[in-house]
């Protein structure tokens, strides 16, 4: 019986740590199912300065206009073209993101095929970024609004104002 109690305690501790880290176990499971385990990711807590990356937003224009990472360049997803990144340095790290990381991973793979050497997907996308208390911007100013792609996806945003 003691071993069973210890197991339950350990489970609650692990789940509690996941929530304390700003990310639920279901969200982590979702991301694990969406991501290619061979594609490199960077977690928000690993980023000390966005200026060390060429930051690309792979969401649609309306999502970008609601808010985006401060130094992000909009490249889109449905309308993405390598012409939109022609001026970027293929040897400098690229950080690409979308809402949760699925669309950005797809565009990231296209960048790798085009010769970009260091492409990283932002783990958890803009939702995880904001849930970690990191800022987003609109028209050069901080904002609390975050486009969540759609109402069903908005359940994963725990901080900020949901827009869809």
Write out the residue ranges for each language-model feature.
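Bacterial Sec-dependent N-terminal signal peptides
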Residues: 1-27
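Short alpha-helical patches at coil-to-helix transitions and adjacent helical residues
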Residues: 6, 104-105
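Conserved G/P- and acidic residue-centered "switch" motifs that form tight phosphate/ATP-binding loops
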Residues: 101
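Short, surface-exposed ligand- or partner-binding patches at beta-edge/loop junctions that are enriched
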Residues: 97
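Rhodanese-like catalytic fold shared by cysteine-dependent sulfurtransferases
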Residues: 21-44, 50, 61, 65-92, ...
């Amino acid at each position: 019986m003691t071993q069973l109690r210890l197991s339950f305690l350990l489970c609650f501790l692990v789940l509690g740590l996941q929530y304390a880290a700003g990310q639920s176990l279901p969200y982590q499971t979702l991301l694990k199912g969406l991501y290619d385990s061979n594609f490199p990711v960077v977690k928000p807590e690993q980023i000390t300065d966005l200026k060390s990356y060429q930051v690309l937003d792979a969401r649609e224009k309306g999502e970008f206009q609601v808010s985006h990472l401060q130094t992000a360049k909009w490249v889109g997803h449905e309308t993405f073209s390598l012409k939109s990144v022609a001026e970027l340095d293929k040897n400098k790290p690229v950080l690409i993101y979308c809402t949760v990381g699925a669309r950005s991973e797809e565009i990231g793979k296209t960048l790798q095929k085009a010769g970009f050497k260091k492409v990283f997907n932002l783990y958890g996308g803009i939702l995880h970024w904001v849930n970690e208390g990191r800022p987003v911007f609109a028209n050069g100013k901080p904002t609390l609004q975050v486009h969540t792609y759609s109402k069903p996806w908005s359940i994963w945003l725990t901080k900020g104002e949901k827009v869809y």
